[in-house]
Amino acid sequence: MKTEQITKAYEMAKERYAALGVDTDKAIETLENTPISLHCWQADDVVGFERNVAASGGIQTTGNYPGKARNIDELRQDIEKVDSLLAGKFRLNLHETYGEFGGKFVDRDEVGVEHFEGWMQWAKEHNMKLDFNSTSFSHPKSGSLTLANPDKEIRDFWIEHTKRCRRIADAMGKFQNDPCIMNIWVHDGSKDLTVNKLRYREILKQSLDEILAEDLPGMKSCLEAKLFGIGLEAYTVGSNYFYTGYCAKNNVMYTLDTGHYEPTENVSDAISALLLYVPELMLHVSRPMHWDSDHVTLFDDNTRNLFSEIVRANALDRAHIGLDYFDASINRIGAY
C-alpha cells in the first residue's frame, strides 16, 4: 500500500475516533514511548553461555528448528536484527547465564558486574536499556529446591547468587541512568504430595527477606509466581498466593506471567486487584496452551484483555511490559 493511501486511511480513522473523544495521535505517541523488554532467551532456546546445556528445572523448550544463537555475538546480531524490523521502543532482558565469562566456568555464586560490562556497553551503543534475572534452574545444585531448600549449604549458595544478581542489576541501572528491573523466579516445589508445605514457604520467606534487605537504588526487584513446573507438579513453594501476600506486605513489585495460572483463569482480572496493593507490576507476556507451554505471543483475546485493563486503569507507568516465551520449532528472529 502506498504511503499516501495509508495516510488517507489514517486521517479518516482519526476523524472517526475523534468523534468518540479518542486522540489517536496521542495514543500512537504513548505506544511509541512505552518500551517492551525483549527476552534474550528466545534466541538460543534458554541455553545461555555458562555450560551450553539444555534448560532444566521445571522448564523445557521443544523443537529443533535450525539457526539458534550459539554465542554472544550471534545473539546480539539477532537482537539487532529484531530491533531493525520492529517499530517501537525496546529494552533487553537478560538471564545471569548470558554473561561474558571469557571461556571460563564462573559458578553462580561467583558472578559479578564485570561479566556484564560488555552487555551494558552494547546496550548503550544500541539505545537499549537492560533488565535482568537471577537464574536458579539448569545447574547441578538446582534440584527441586533452591531458596526454599532446608539444606543450608545449598540455600546459601542460591542466596549468594541472587544477592550478586541484584548488585549486577544495580550497576546496570546506574550505568543506563534508569532502573534495571530484576526478576526473581525459583522453580522450587515437589513432584508428589508434600507433608509440610508451610516449612518450605517459611524458608523461602526468610531467604527473600535476607536477599531484599540490601538497599540498591539502581534496580527494582520483582517476584514471580508459578502454578507448577515439569517434574514439580504437586506443589510450588512460590505460588500466586505466596507472592501476592509477600509483595503486598513488603511493597515489592509483582511479576505476572500469563502462562503461570490455571488455564481457565482470566489473568487480566488480576491487574486491577494487584494494583491496589503492590507498587508496580512486571508483565511476562506469553501464550499458554493448556499449561505454561510458552508459545509465541499473539494479539489474541487474552492479550488484548490484559492490556485493556492496564490502559483503563491508567497504569502504563506502573506496569512494565516484557515477553517470556521460547519456541524452538520456528525461526528465532521471527518469533519476536
Model-derived features: positions:
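Alpha/beta catalytic barrel-like cores
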Residues: 1-150, 157, 166-168, 178-180, ...
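Active-site groove signature of glycoside hydrolases
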Residues: 166-195
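Short glycine/serine/threonine/alanine-rich loop segments
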Residues: 128, 174, 252
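Short, flexible active-site-adjacent loop segments at beta-strand->alpha-helix junctions, enriched
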Residues: 134-136, 188-190, 227
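Short glycine-centered, acidic/aromatic-flanked micro-motifs in structured strand/loop junctions
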Residues: 96, 186-188, 225, 258
